[in-house]
Each structure stands twice: as C-alpha cells, then as structure tokens.
Design a protein with these regions (language model features):
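Glycine- and small/polar-enriched repetitive beta-structure motifs of secreted/surface proteins
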Residues: 1-194
C-alpha cells in the first residue's frame, strides 16, 4: 500500500507500491516505482522508475530532479537536488550536501557510492554529457570537498571544516585529508595524505 499526503503527492502513481510521501509534489511523477520515502516540499518529485528503488528523501527539494536513481538517502534542504539521472547508493546529510551533482546522460558517467555530511559538503557539479566518474568519495564537515565542480573524483576523503575545499583537479583520486581546513589550498594531486 501507499501513503500520500499533500497537493499532487503521488499524483501519477498507477501501480507503485510501498511508497510514503508527505508534502506538495512529493513523488508526483512516479508511476510504478516502489519502496520510496519522500518527506518535504517536492522531495523525489520527478522520480519515475519501475524498480524497487528504496530512495529516502527528507527535506525540501531533496532528490527533486532524480528520475531513475536507487538506494539514495538524503536529509536536509536542497540535498542532491540537481541529480537527475541514475545517481545511486549516495548518502547525503546537511543543507545543500551534494547539491550540484548531476551525472548527466553519458552512459559512462557515474555519481554513485558517495557520502556527504555537512553544509555544502561534496557539492559536485553537472557533468554535461561527459564520461565523468565521481564515485566512492567521503566528505564530512561544512564545505568539505566542495570545490570539485564537474571534475572526476574517486576515493577521495575529506573530514573537517573546509578540508580539501579548493580541490578542483580531476587527478586527485585517493587523497585523504583529516582535520580543520586540512589541505585547504590543494587543487590537484593523487594520493596525498594529511
């Protein structure tokens, strides 16, 4: 069974099951997707996939534009709100965490398996049809790893306020920065540890 409260909540649902939505426009375009939870104005608004998706969006505009992503968890306003394709297995908590991540339509592009906790943590960018891989990153702390834009990033870890905040280079995979403003000025470079 489904539970929907709010103007146009689950508006298009035909045979989706086990969905819970509360708020205006939550899960509005979902026709057949299952096991989603959307709480907050326009959370999961454009999701429309016929799979057991298990997405959880709590907060205004969370996962608002996503269409097919699965197993995402977002808590806070404007979290993962630009993601609009198959972004999956991401956990983002805090105002505007992963707010600009959008893997685009390129078949090889990935924005999966990331963890972002804190204000604007792991902001990301729109890949604009490029085969960018943005996977396995961890950002914990306000503005941690927030400057990557649309560049590739794999296995990068930033823990602490503004840790790796200036990192923009796509050749910085495997870098680990722990502590207040740790490697704050680093813009590129693989395998650094601080």
């Amino acid at each position: 069974s489904n539970h929907a409260i709010g103007y146009q909540s689950q508006l298009a649902n035909v045979d989706g099951v086990a969905n819970v939505s509360f708020g205006r426009g939550t899960l509005a375009t979902n026709v057949s997707g299952n096991h989603n939870t959307a709480i907050g104005h326009q959370a999961l608004e454009t999701f429309n996939s016929d799979v057991d998706a298990y997405n959880t969006a709590v907060g205004m505009n969370n996962l608002q534009a996503i269409t097919t992503g699965i197993y995402n968890t977002s808590v806070g306003a404007l979290v993962l709100d630009a993601a609009s394709f198959g972004e999956s297995f991401n956990t983002a908590i805090g105002f505007a965490a992963m707010t600009s991540v959008n893997e685009g339509a390129h078949a090889s592009a990935q924005a999966d398996h990331n963890v972002a906790v804190g204000y604007n943590a792991l902001e990301g960018g729109a890949f604009a049809g490029n085969p960018v891989v943005f996977t396995g990153n961890i950002a914990i702390g306000s503005l941690a790893l927030d400057g990557t834009g649309a560049n590739a990033q794999t296995g990068t870890i930033a823990i602490g306020y503004e840790a790796l905040t200036a990192l923009t280079g796509s050749s910085s995979s495997g870098t680990v920065a722990i502590g207040y403003q740790s490697m704050e000025a680093l813009t590129a470079g693989d395998g650094n540890t601080a």
